[in-house]
Amino acid sequence: MLFWAAHLLLSLQLVYCWAFSCQRTESSPGFSLPGDFLLAGLFSLHGDCLQVRHRPLVTSCDRPDSFNGHGYHLFQAMRFTVEEINNSSALLPNITLGYELYDVCSESANVYATLRVLALQGPRHIEIQKDLRNHSSKVVAFIGPDNTDHAVTTAALLGPFLMPLVSYEASSVVLSAKRKFPSFLRTVPSDRHQVEVMVQLLQSFGWVWISLIGSYGDYGQLGVQALEELAVPRGICVAFKDIVPFSARVGDPRMQSMMQHLAQARTTVVVVFSNRHLARVFFRSVVLANLTGKVWVASEDWAISTYITSVTGIQGIGTVLGVAVQQRQVPGLKEFEESYVRAVTAAPSACPEGSWCSTNQLCRECHTFTTRNMPTLGAFSMSAAYRVYEAVYAVAHGLHQLLGCTSEICSRGPVYPWQLLQQIYKVNFLLHENTVAFDDNGDTLGYYDIIAWDWNGPEWTFEIIGSASLSPVHLDINKTKIQWHGKNNQVPVSVCTTDCLAGHHRVVVGSHHCCFECVPCEAGTFLNMSELHICQPCGTEEWAPKESTTCFPRTVEFLAWHEPISLVLIAANTLLLLLLVGTAGLFAWHFHTPVVRSAGGRLCFLMLGSLVAGSCSFYSFFGEPTVPACLLRQPLFSLGFAIFLSCLTIRSFQLVIIFKFSTKVPTFYRTWAQNHGAGLFVIVSSTVHLLICLTWLVMWTPRPTREYQRFPHLVILECTEVNSVGFLLAFTHNILLSISTFVCSYLGKELPENYNEAKCVTFSLLLNFVSWIAFFTMASIYQGSYLPAVNVLAGLTTLSGGFSGYFLPKCYVILCRPELNNTEHFQASIQDYTRRCGTT
């Protein structure tokens, strides 16, 4: 809306000048050429005086010391192109193109030129019409202007008429908006691509801490905005950003303040997205402030402009890299300019003060050149001239299609701007092996050169160090071609904080994400290079040490069969089983002997069988835990040992009853013997323990589990039984049985020698208590894969103690002291006990 308001205001201002001051239409030679169809060319042959105006007058362009050599070359490029097309028999064969060229040195001159071309031939005004389809003007298309600010104004004025406007230098993204600027096209790539190239250039060197300077106007301000919006999400921080004012002067307070802030920003890299006019003011201020040792990244408008390189002292500011539209040559342009200089030797005719001629179509310097002092056609101007060349050819091809031209003739009918615009959008042709075409936004795809300034003393040139293709943008840079300003030709570093060490994540300090502290990642987390601000946790099956950048697979551990400790325990358990089976065979062979009968007779086989069951449970502790193994290992051992303790308890209790209570309490003894008290106790005790185990298996079912918490780098495969309520109930029952056994054996400590088992039983129970105390102590401090081995060792010690304390002495008598295994010896022992009891 601001643009439209400005356009309307300027139009009203210019009407005053037009109506009262501009009565003559004389022009300097070379500004116009008659033809069947005319093109309007808008070029800045002079610079804007940037003066403050108090009256709505059009700026006079032809002022001393304001000549613009670059605009002159573009002016000549259009003249050359039209002449080349007119001399061609393949393009517009019987049609002659003409032109009206204008010097648009200022915004007012630009608007004035646009309105003058749109005006009707006779009355010199623009008729207000309801339908603009049949609107006709002296030209069919515009070429230019040369900057975004002027192009926005011209495009807005021409848009309602759908008058084609093909610019050769206006690159701002805003001009791609077809709803605002429907008739605008360009032969220079959009700044949308330039911004992408510049951001990728920064990324390729790792520069993430930059300053950003733009020029006043659409080109610089929109370019800076687009660059910041694209750079920040990619990890680039803008430490300082400012705009060079339109009225900036070297040494004024505004520029001094900018230089101070730029120095305080501590950035090595400064991106200058500016038109060349304000860029010159900026760099003169840089030289004055002695801001050296930096890398300056140039936008295409000034990257290879001699207007900037001519600033005194600029060769000492540091390294200059830039983005430039790919270099192209216009064959014959230089010779054309030389012939023009030789042909035009007379001075232009004088124009009355205030006439149109003195405003927009007069170039006094153009007629004073010789072939020796004419403006040098450098690479920057030649590249821009080629885009003028493309623009004129694009219009010519569109007109060729609109007129239905054959190889020999074109139809001659009325041509309306909107019709020609449609055809220009459709053009697609080769021009010196380069494709010329437009997309739906009127933009053309091209290529950029990545350049670096090169100084040889006072002589300046530039080196093409790479290129950038578009859609998508891809950079190819040869970094070895760059001569850096620092020591040892090293690539400068531009960061707020140096990169963290491996395994350290960033904690942002302040408002810029490029300024951060480095904090080490904790164990179990790692730093993913795609997210440098967060240490990510490892997966369940993974682990990581402190300060890690990756996770490692956890080692799965369990008590394997082939482990040395496993082999030792298996061998010991197998030996115990063989001893138990051998003892059972030995007792069966000597079943009717006094030793076996005094040990319990048939009850011995139940005791040996329970020990065998407990011993067999140990094999389920080895190998990877499975459901059957977890169900069997602890309950089977606990039940077997409970039966053994029940038998041992009742055997000790029964001996006490026989020797001590049979005579003192005969009624109790008879009741106990008649009701099979010993067998009933064993059955009841074993049944209680069996019910505990069944409840354990149902309510707190042991099952295989993977334990992750104990060791960060290990996964322990185990069964969930040790900490369950069922295990504690079963273990408590066995403790009670052990205490009962100890009490009963202690009561029989004075029994006959052959029946006195107090010492052996106490030894067995002592081993039982010690082994399980050791196991639980170890389990509280060690939770590794060898814990099942400790469990087996404790159980094996318990069973071995029970076997050795009760059965081993009897086996010794049977095998080694057979003379003691007879009735006479046992009777003598009983008689001796009776005599001792009688004396007391």
From Swiss-Prot:
Compartments where found: Cell membrane
Signal sequence segment: 1-19
Mode of membrane association: Multi-pass membrane protein
Gene3D superfamilies: 3.40.50.2300, GPCR, family 3, nine cysteines domain
GO molecular function annotations of the record: G protein-coupled receptor activity; taste receptor activity
Membrane-side (Extracellular) residue stretches: 20-566, 624-638, 701-724, 782-786
Quaternary data: Forms heterodimers with TAS1R3.
Name of the protein in question: Taste receptor type 1 member 1
Species this protein is from: Rattus norvegicus
Lineage: Eukaryota, Metazoa, Chordata, Craniata, Vertebrata
Gene this chain is encoded by: Tas1r1
